[in-house]
A protein has these predicted regions:
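Membrane-embedded alpha-helical segments of integral membrane proteins
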Residues: 1-44
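Short, flexible coil/linker elements and helix-boundary hinge sites characteristic
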Residues: 34, 95-98, 152
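Cytoplasmic juxtamembrane regions at transmembrane-helix boundaries
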Residues: 41-54, 132-138
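Internal/C-terminal transmembrane anchor helices
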Residues: 49-83
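Cytosolic juxtamembrane regulatory segments of multi-pass membrane proteins
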Residues: 52-53, 97-107
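Alpha-helical transmembrane signal-anchor/signal-peptide segments
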Residues: 76-98
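Extracytosolic and intramembrane catalytic regions of membrane-associated proteins
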Residues: 102-156
């Protein structure tokens, strides 16, 4: 009935991006300076083994950067899909219009929405329950967390 919402996987991909860049950047910087030294050496010192090592180091650095970029795009696509699915799920379950996700992390998202009655709610926490059913909670007039029904957001 509800579309799958997964905010954990994009965060994992972002962690992979960070790890890949931690290895790729120093490796690439080292390869750059080694290439400069290699080119400045006399012809007798420019051996095939050194050239091969530099190519391997440069290729590995470039490969890691390409994997980091691919992981970043995968995270972006996954986040966008989960955001669209969450908006669709909220609009399916609750009598609301104009749902906008303003913030997110691995377990919840902050949403702003307008009910069918025209009441605007800002900074509601949207969780996913069983089978990706959205659960909205928020505060009103300094109260503790209130459910969607207590905030006047009707179910469909």
């Amino acid at each position: 009935m509800y579309l799958p919402v997964d905010f954990h996987t994009p965060l994992l991909y972002l962690a992979v991006v960070g790890i890949l860049l931690v290895f790729a950047l120093p490796l690439g910087i080292s390869a750059f300076f080694r290439w400069r030294t290699f080119r400045a050496d006399a012809n007798g010192l420019q051996t095939y083994a050194r050239r091969r090592d530099l190519r391997i180091q440069s290729g590995l650095s470039i490969g890691l950067v390409v994997l980091a970029i691919a992981s970043a795009f995968t995270a972006l696509i996954g986040w966008q899909k989960s955001t669209n699915n969450l908006v669709s799920n909220v609009e399916t379950r609750y009598a609301v219009t104009d749902v906008r996700v303003t913030n997110w992390n691995g377990t919840w998202a902050q949403v702003d929405l307008v009910t069918d009655d025209g009441v605007k709610h800002d900074d509601l926490s949207a969780y996913t329950g069983d089978f990706y059913a959205p659960i909205l909670q928020g505060t009103m007039a300094g109260n503790s967390q209130l459910s969607a029904e207590e905030l006047g957001i009707k179910l469909r």
